[in-house]
């Protein structure tokens, strides 16, 4: 069984390896065959004047640039929030604070619970690569890797050179087929024109598909967008919130040891030591009243009101997010300079000189103006609602923050100072717990006897009985109205007597430490025959008459 499972895992790894490297072998093999056909067409005499050595040189140059860009795009890491071992990247110098223009679909900051690291703007988690990729465009199966910040330029150049190579191969092969194969019967019985015809068909089809794909990616690069940002709806931070959120969310704090390690090196790691996005729910920090008092626990009506207000705010945020333009569109010139680098001599070569670190992004001036305008409109709308009596001038009522870390699994302690929260039964039956509150039934911390009386009460009764008995026996004259206090009784003796009296829970007084078995022994001793002097032996021991067995 174990051997079969081991072979199954090996087969799975082999299949995954084949699926990973097959696209690479296919691209290298197909392009090599195409350039070989182009060179052969140039070496064959044709009626076309431009097909020859020059066409072969251009084809080889495009082939070299194509494979150079392809190799660079495949083997260049796209950039991630963590390293190869899964640890958060620690910079060697102080970096500026990361910006947060985008949020999750529920309006919260972006955080990856799989990588346990903050996801900056334009970063996404790839399930195939199992890491978060900075400025992720998409995961390309033909490259067997993700297209991100560091290899996006090489990928776009690969598409451009592939399209040019396909169009050039199609032009060379199609011209040869048009001038030679269709007008001359010399090549009918030869196998060489088959490759020429296949190249014209394959290069034409691939050129149309890859050319359209290349045009679309050039348009995205010109607009400052990625494939994910174009196909998916981007949720921006609410206009009423501060764009550069410098406050630390307790839910996003790093462990104590990691924070000490970062502080020791005097580095502030964006995304690890500062808040961001999360697939898990992370509450926004709430402010407390100016007087510093803690908010009381909300009632059911207040909680319903808060939920309605929150849903309404989320609806307005969704509408405002759709009205905002692309925050990363800085103009087509600056967008292309960001992708291809500031050096014009390196624009046509797959050298990674893309500007930026993937953590901080500059916002578009158009987006900032639109955000400020929407913020002013929201404030005016809220003021109109308050004046019309539809809302409260205050924000959503504050509720106590839930504990984070290991303490988030414990139930919060009840707030005794605030009003009582209605239970589910009270809400269903329409009862108010404040009207039918029972009196407190606090039990004092005293030592109680088995019949519910305290030991002090038993001692007081015992003292009274001992005092009365002593007066009756020794001083009958003072027993009627005199006062006497026995001072010779020790406290330990009185406590033992009180404990013995406390154990007498039945009225016959026969219940003692022996319990039920002790009472049975006493009853059996009372039912034994009466001892007479004749029944005593000389040694003084009693003699019992054996009645025998019936």
Curated annotation (Swiss-Prot):
Residue stretches of biased makeup (Basic and acidic residues): 274-285, 491-502
Topological type in the membrane: Multi-pass membrane protein
Catalytic activity: L-cysteinyl-[protein] + hexadecanoyl-CoA = S-hexadecanoyl-L-cysteinyl-[protein] + CoA
Family annotation (PANTHER family): PALMITOYLTRANSFERASE ZDHHC16 (PTHR12246)
Protein name: Palmitoyltransferase PFA3
Family to which this protein belongs: Belongs to the DHHC palmitoyltransferase family. PFA3 subfamily.
Region Disordered, annotated ranges: 272-304, 378-422, 434-550
Compositionally biased region (Polar residues): 523-542
EC top class, as a word: transferase
GO cellular component: vacuolar membrane
Domain DHHC: 110-160
UniProt feature, compositional bias: Acidic residues: 457-470
């Amino acid at each position: 069984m174990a051997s079969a499972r081991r072979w199954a895992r090996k087969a799975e790894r082999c299949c995954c390896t084949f699926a990973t490297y097959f696209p690479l072998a296919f691209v290298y093999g197909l392009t090599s065959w195409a350039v070989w056909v182009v060179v052969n067409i140039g070496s064959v005499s044709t009626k076309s004047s431009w097909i020859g050595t020059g066409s072969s040189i251009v084809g080889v140059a495009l082939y070299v640039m194509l494979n150079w860009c392809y190799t660079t795009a495949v083997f260049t890491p796209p950039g991630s929030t963590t390293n190869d071992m899964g640890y958060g990247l620690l910079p060697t110098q102080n970096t500026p604070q990361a910006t947060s223009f985008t949020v999750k679909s529920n309006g919260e900051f972006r955080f990856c619970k799989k990588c346990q690291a903050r996801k900056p703007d334009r970063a996404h988690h790839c399930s195939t690569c199992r890491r978060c990729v900075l400025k992720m465009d998409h995961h390309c199966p033909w490259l067997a890797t993700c297209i991100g910040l560091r290899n996006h330029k090489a990928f776009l150049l690969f598409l451009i050179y592939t399209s040019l190579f396909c169009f050039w191969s199609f032009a060379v092969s199609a011209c040869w087929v048009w001038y030679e194969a269709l007008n001359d019967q010399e090549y009918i019985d030869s196998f060489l024109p088959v490759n020429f015809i296949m190249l014209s068909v394959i290069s034409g089809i691939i050129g149309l598909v890859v050319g359209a794909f290349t045009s679309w990616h050039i348009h995205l690069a010109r607009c400052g967008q990625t494939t994910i940002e174009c196909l998916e709806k981007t949720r921006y931070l609410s206009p009423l919130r501060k764009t550069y959120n410098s406050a630390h969310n307790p839910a996003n704090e790093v462990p104590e040891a990691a924070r000490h390690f970062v502080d020791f090196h005097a580095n502030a790691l964006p995304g690890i030591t500062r808040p961001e996005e999360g697939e898990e729910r992370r509450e926004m920090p709430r402010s407390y009243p100016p007087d510093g008092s803690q908010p009381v626990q909300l009632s059911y009506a207040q909680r319903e009101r808060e939920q309605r207000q929150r849903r309404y705010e989320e609806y307005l945020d969704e509408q405002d997010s759709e009205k905002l333009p692309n925050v990363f569109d800085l103009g087509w010139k600056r967008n292309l300079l960001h992708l291809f680098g500031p050096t014009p001599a390196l624009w046509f070569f797959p050298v990674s000189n893309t500007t930026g670190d993937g953590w901080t992004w500059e916002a578009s001036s158009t987006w900032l103006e639109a955000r400020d305008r929407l913020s002013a409109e929201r404030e005016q709308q809220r003021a109109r609602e308050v004046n019309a009596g539809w809302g409260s001038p205050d924000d959503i009522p504050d509720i106590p923050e839930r504990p984070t870390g290991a303490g988030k699994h414990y139930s919060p302690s009840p707030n005794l100072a605030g009003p009582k929260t209605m239970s589910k039964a009270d809400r269903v039956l329409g009862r108010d717990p404040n009207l039918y509150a029972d009196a407190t039934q606090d039990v004092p911390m005293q030592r109680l006897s088995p019949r519910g009386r305290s030991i002090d009460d038993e001692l007081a009764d015992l003292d009274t009985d001992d005092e009365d008995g002593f007066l009756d026996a020794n001083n009958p004259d003072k027993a009627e109205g005199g006062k006497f206090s026995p001072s010779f009784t020790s406290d330990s003796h009185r406590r033992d007597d009180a404990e013995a009296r406390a154990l007498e829970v039945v009225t016959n007084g026969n219940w003692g430490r022996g319990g039920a078995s002790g009472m049975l022994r006493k009853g059996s001793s009372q039912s034994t025959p009466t001892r007479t002097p004749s029944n005593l032996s000389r040694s003084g021991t009693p003699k019992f008459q054996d009645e025998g067995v019936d």
